A protein has these predicted regions:
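Non-catalytic C-terminal accessory region of glycerolipid acyltransferases
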Residues: 14, 22-34, 40-41, 68, ...
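Conserved pre-ATP/AMP-binding loop-to-beta segment of ANL
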Residues: 264, 378-416, 422-423, 446-452
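Conserved AMP-binding/adenylate-forming core of the ANL superfamily
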Residues: 268-298, 302-319, 336-341, 391-395, ...
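Structural core segment of the AMP-binding/adenylate-forming
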Residues: 296, 323-390, 499, 697-701
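AMP-binding/adenylate-forming catalytic core of the ANL superfamily
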Residues: 352, 598, 604, 609-610, ...
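Conserved C-terminal "lid"/linker of ANL adenylate-forming enzymes
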Residues: 376-381, 652, 680-683, 692-694, ...
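Conserved AMP-binding/adenylation subdomain of ANL enzymes
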Residues: 435-452, 460-501, 516
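Gly/Ser/Thr-rich phosphate-binding loop
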Residues: 500-505, 514-573, 585-587
């Protein structure tokens, strides 16, 4: 410092002016800064970006140690949400990487100066040589930063993943490090509109780095098939990234509150045709108010029955139960008193909450009277009369927190199996189960603030509860709840009036809507998602021809909260139920007599806590070793698509050959698309078993079925030995055939000669 002062004094004595002196000092300082930057062990530009991002966006990095585990020639695969993603990548890497940049993007005038500050190579799908150059760079020890989507997202979700990006990883043999960036999508640097995202100037940015993985493609695949397989694997890695980095270590009520904070408390959460719209604030405050009354109905962690239709009141009641630390047991009011009481016994339910107006409108007085002899009936109308202004004010002040704190692994809800094959069992689902399944679905389907869900599936059904209510609530997507899926003329009109973009249903319901609807009623709908039963070809064709919409068929079971597999706009194959969702492991156990496929067992974070059975009331029976036996026989092809062959219990052994009853029913639905049919197997002394087809088709005959099956190339063994015509096939609330009742019809009939 003294030396510098003497030097300045000397220069002034020889006549150097102050401006020139200051300019010289600045030049020396700049040279010193450049020299320090060159000699520093870390990259000064990277450090500068890190300082800016940490200062303005409070950048938080999780799992940074996984970058070191990947080795020197790793491929860093990031989701692409904004123009700042490249700066984020530079700030978290110690080594100077090579950026794979889209060729067209790299040619833009304002991009060129930025690329000069980094090492970048253009990735041009039309020029294989560019891909080979990148493969060579990685093989020689370079770290490659790549955005597999090839463009900034305009949906808010994961977009198309290019095969070329996967080919680099597969050919180079390098480890792929999945990285997710969250927060920047809300800034002005993203390509999402204000309608798609709630804009924030300086949101917190979180970067999550997962464990490195290696692409391993089947050696038998060559050429285009190998390239596509690598692309599908990279998409799987990226969708797993989205799922695993979605918060699920919380309760459903906490997730709804978090959604309200992000999306806005005034945003519409739920809507029904009777009570209108409820904002997140009204929904959460209402739940907190009711929670104070629900605590008196049962002890903490105990089950309370909920018997309500799809309506705002059901959503408020469910969240209120969760806030109170009580477990809502969803009662299927279409199941009849015997099955309902068996369900109450299994779940140790002593109190059922319902609505007096609902009971009157649905004409359930007789059912409620039967239930009241065994369990206590509590009406919401009576509870509301006990709520004071003070209670409402307290709830408003405390609505951001549950009344009784619970953890993610505590029970959140009890659903009951359909009872289509026997006595209903209780299925205990945790908060983590529900939130994980919602996150699994959200990782594959792009939807957001501009969407609106229309849900007619009852909340006592796993599909209706998780996908139709919990998923939109925790995602900030408004949901329109309608109490009956059977109003085929009303539902299309309401979808049209609500401008709904996503519709859930079963084949039975979707077929009814399509027949009754005007061709313009579903003009706003983007996605039609079907589950619970196979989608018939006639239904699929009707929706495509009349509305220009394809039905995305999925598959799930109550025990997995429920979704397991789903066709998506990117990966869709008719005749299958799509590919398994992220986070789900599957194994197939061979079935005697079946040449391909096997009995499906699944494991994952969405698998239930366990069963509750009527012969062991209140005792939880967890799945063995975390694996659930779905009871379904399936095949999974090389590309991961799942095809349902039928229920393991619903195969008949005829003449030593296994025949799927579901396949016979499928043929019947194709032959008589306007009539519902079901097949029952009964003992036969000569051939082991015989098939009885029960159908609503008035003029159905065995000869007509046999001729159609032969024309379709089906086995002669699939022809039923007998056709039984009924006025109305017994069905469950989900629209599926009530197989217990159908079997009862067959067993109780007078045997008639086969037609």
């Amino acid at each position: 410092m003294v030396g510098g002062a003497l030097l300045v004094a000397l220069l002034q004595n020889v006549g150097v002016s102050v401006p020139v002196l200051l300019l010289g000092i600045a030049a020396v300082g700049l040279l010193a800064a450049l020299w320090i930057g060159k000699t520093m062990p870390t990259n000064a530009f990277h450090d500068f970006l890190a300082i800016l991002l940490r200062g303005f966006y409070r950048l938080e990095v999780r799992g940074g140690e996984n970058l070191d585990r990947a080795g020197p020639n790793a491929i860093i695969a990031l989701n692409h949400v904004s123009f700042l993603d490249g700066a984020v990548a530079l700030s978290i890497l110690k080594k100077e990487p090579v950026f794979a940049v889209d060729h067209a993007f790299a040619q833009r005038w304002w991009v060129r100066p930025i690329l000069k500050l980094t090492r970048a190579m253009a990735l041009n799908p039309a020029r294989p040589l560019a891909t080979r150059t990148l493969i060579h760079a990685v093989s020689n020890g370079e770290t490659l930063v790549i955005f597999p989507e090839g463009r900034i997202t305009v949906t808010g979700g994961l977009m198309k993943v290019y095969d070329g990006a996967a080919l680099i990883g597969e050919k180079s043999g390098a480890m792929i490090v999945p990285v997710r960036i969250e927060g920047l999508e809300a800034t002005i640097f993203s390509r999402l509109s204000r309608a798609q995202v709630r804009r924030r100037w300086l949101p917190r940015v979180r970067v999550t780095v997962l464990e490195p993985v290696r692409l391993e493609v089947d050696n038998a695949l060559k050429g285009k098939a190998r390239r596509q397989a690598a692309g599908a694997m990279l998409y799987q890695i990226m969708s797993d990234l989205i799922f695993r980095t979605t918060p699920t270590d919380r309760t459903v009520i906490d997730a709804v509150v978090d959604a309200a904070k992000i999306q806005g408390w005034r945003r519409i959460a739920v809507e029904d045709p009777v009570t209108g719209k409820l904002s997140y604030r009204k929904l959460v405050v209402g739940a907190r108010v009711l929670a104070g009354r629900f605590t008196a109905l049962a002890g903490e962690g105990e089950a309370v029955g909920v018997m309500l239709p799809n309506a705002n009141g059901a959503a408020v009641t469910l969240l209120g139960m969760m806030s109170a630390g009580r477990v809502p047991a969803m009662i299927n009011f279409t199941a009849g008193p015997t099955n309902i009481l068996a369900a109450c016994t299994a779940a140790a339910v002593r109190t059922i909450v319902t609505s007096r107006s609902f009971v009157e409108r649905a004409r359930l007085e007789k059912l409620v009277g039967s239930l009241a002899e065994v369990v206590r009936i509590v009406y919401l109308e009576d509870l509301r009369q006990t709520i004071s202004l003070v209670d409402k004010v307290r709830a408003l002040l405390a609505c951001r927190h549950a009344l009784v704190p619970r953890s993610a692994d505590d029970p959140a809800a009890i659903l009951f199996t359909s009872g289509s094959e026997g006595t209903p069992k209780g299925v205990m689902l945790s908060h983590r189960n529900l939130l994980c399944n919602a996150a699994q679905a959200a990782a594959r389907i792009d939807f957001g603030r501009t969407d609106k869900v229309f849900n007619t599936l009852p909340v006592f059904h796993a599909f209706g509860l998780t996908v139709g209510l919990v998923l939109p609530l925790v995602s900030g997507v408004p949901v329109f709840l309608y109490p009956s899926p059977l109003h085929y003329r009303v539902v299309p009109e309401l979808v049209y009036g609500a401008n709904a973009t996503i519709l859930f249903g079963t084949d039975t319901f979707l077929s009814g809507y399509a027949r009754a609807a005007h061709p313009y009623d579903f003009r706003s709908v983007r996605y039609v998602l079907a589950g619970a039963e196979p989608v018939k070809e006639a239904t699929r064709r009707l929706w495509a021809e009349k509305f220009g919409l394809r039905i995305l068929e999925g598959y799930g079971v109550t025990e997995t909260a429920p979704a397991l597999a789903l066709n998506t706009p990117m990966f869709n194959r008719f005749g299958t139920v799509g590919r398994l969702l992220p986070g789900i492991e599957a194994k197939l156990v061979p079935v005697e007599g079946m040449e391909e496929g096997g009995r499906l067992y699944v494991s994952g974070p969405n698998v239930m806590l366990g069963y509750l059975k009527a012969n062991q009331p209140g005792i939880l029976v967890p799945p063995e070793d975390g694996w659930h036996d779905t009871g379904d026989v399936v095949t999974i092809d090389r590309e991961g698509y799942v095809t349902i062959k039928g229920r393991a219990k619903r195969f008949a052994k005829i003449g030593g050959e296994m025949i799927s009853l579901a396949s016979v029913e499928s043929l019947a639905s194709e032959l008589w698309p306007d009539a519902q049919s079901a097949v029952v197997a009964e003992p036969d002394p000569r051939r082991g078993e015989r098939l009885v087809l029960v159908t609503e088709k008035e003029d159905a005959t065995r000869a007509a079925f046999q001729a159609y099956a032969k024309a379709k190339g089906a086995s002669d063994l699939m022809a039923p030995a007998e056709v039984m015509v009924v006025d109305k096939l017994p069905v469950l609330g989900s629209g599926k055939a009530d197989l217990v009742s159908v079997t009862g019809l067959v067993m109780g009939r007078q045997r008639v000669a086969a037609a």
